[in-house]
Amino acid sequence: FPDGEFLMQGCPECKLGENRFFSKPGAPVYQCTGCCFSRAYPTPLRSKKTMLVPKNITSEATCCVAKAFTKITLKDNVKIENHTECHCSTCYYHKS
C-alpha cells in the first residue's frame, strides 16, 4: 500500500472528530479517532529466547494520537486537551 496508508473495512482513517460530550454550541471540542497500522506475526526464535515470558505472537501497532492540541478549561476547573491535528504514532496505552 502506498506510504503504508490503507483503510480497513469498517474502520475510518485517523482524523479529528467532534467530542459531543464536551462540546458546547459555538465551542466544539475535538479528539483524534480512527485506525492506524497494526500487524501480528510469529515471534522469531532468537527473540523468544531473550523473553522473560516467551510469547508465540509478536504484534506491532501505531495509534491515532494528537500531533497538536490546545489545553482548555471546562466548568468546575476541569482541564482537557482539544486536539487540533492527528497522526499515527507510538501507542502509549496498551491492554495487558
UniProtKB/Swiss-Prot annotation:
Glycans are attached at residues 56, 82. It holds the Pfam family Hormone_6. InterPro entries: Cystine-knot_cytokine, Glyco_hormone. It comes from the Eukaryota. SMART domains: GHA (SM00067). GO terms for cellular component: extracellular space; follicle-stimulating hormone complex. Keywords: Disulfide bond, Glycoprotein, Hormone, Secreted. GO terms for biological process: G protein-coupled receptor signaling pathway; positive regulation of steroid biosynthetic process; regulation of signaling receptor activity; thyroid hormone generation. Its main location: secreted. GO terms for molecular function: follicle-stimulating hormone activity. Disulfide bonds join 11-35, 14-64, 32-86, 36-88, 63-91. It is found in: Secreted. Heterodimer. Glycoprotein hormones are heterodimers composed of a common alpha chain described here and a unique beta chain which confers their biological specificity to the different hormones. Belongs to the glycoprotein hormones subunit alpha family. Shared alpha chain of heterodimeric glycoprotein hormones. These hormones bind specific receptors on target cells that in turn activate downstream signaling pathways. This is Glycoprotein hormones alpha chain. It comes from Struthio camelus.
